[in-house]
Amino acid sequence: MATDISESSGADCKGDTKNSAKLDADYPLRVLYCGVCSLPTEYCEYMPDVAKCRQWLEKNFPNEFAKLTVENSPKQETGITEGQGPVGEEEEKKKQKRGGRGQIKQKKKTVPQKVTIAKIPRAKKKYVTRVCGLATFEIDLKEAQRFFAQKFSCGASVTGEDEIIIQGDFTDDIIDVIQEKWPEVDDDSIEDLGEVKK
């Protein structure tokens, strides 16, 4: 008896999924992909450029856009109050949406573009050369560190956010080397501080 019940219930479950799937859609399925984010149009709302996706959909497929706006309209009607705009939009802006890094914000350049070179004494007659400010010219510090180490045949390391320490006294040569390698760094933006204590 127990085996008969489980078999019949198992057959019903399998039959239900097949029947419901056939009723909902025609096979083969035709999926509409967004021209902006390349996802199906149902998933565009989870991307950072929702406005661009909606504009593309409205321009290329106005009837699909109308279906989407009709589906979303009950949510918006509940958020509208008298004398105010839609509250739902404000709440959407406050909440973080999933999917991607979001919109990339441009960094504001408030730091003046200046490269400073200083000679710092170590032990006895040994010196290190400190180069600061290369990052303000959008120069990769790791690449610059490798270049200095290879050019001067010495050790070099990135120590701070915008600081490279080169083992040895290269204050005379380094100005010319920087201008050869990175022409965007002009002579006026390089300042030699001379010998500086730690």
Swiss-Prot record:
Entries under Pfam families matching the protein: DENR_N, SUI1
Sequence ranges of Polar residues compositional bias: 72-81
GO biological process: formation of translation preinitiation complex; IRES-dependent viral translational initiation; ribosome disassembly
Protein name: Density-regulated protein
Main location class: cytoplasm
Subcellular location: Cytoplasm
Family: Belongs to the DENR family.
Region (Disordered): 72-109
Organism superkingdom: Eukaryota
Matching SUPFAM superfamilies: eIF1-like
Role according to the record: Translation regulator forming a complex with MCTS1 to promote translation reinitiation. Translation reinitiation is the process where the small ribosomal subunit remains attached to the mRNA following termination of translation of a regulatory upstream ORF (uORF), and resume scanning on the same mRNA molecule to initiate translation of a downstream ORF, usually the main ORF (mORF). The MCTS1/DENR complex is pivotal to two linked mechanisms essential for translation reinitiation.
Location of the SUI1 domain: 115-182
Phosphoserine: modified positions: 20, 73, 189
Alphabetical UniProt keywords: Acetylation, Cytoplasm, Initiation factor, Phosphoprotein, Protein biosynthesis
Composition skew (Basic residues), residue ranges: 95-109
Subunit structure: Interacts with MCTS1 (via PUA domain); the complex regulates translation reinitiation.
Species name: Mus musculus
GO CC terms: cytoplasm
GO molecular function terms attached to this record: translation initiation factor activity
Modified residues annotated as N-acetylalanine in this record: 2
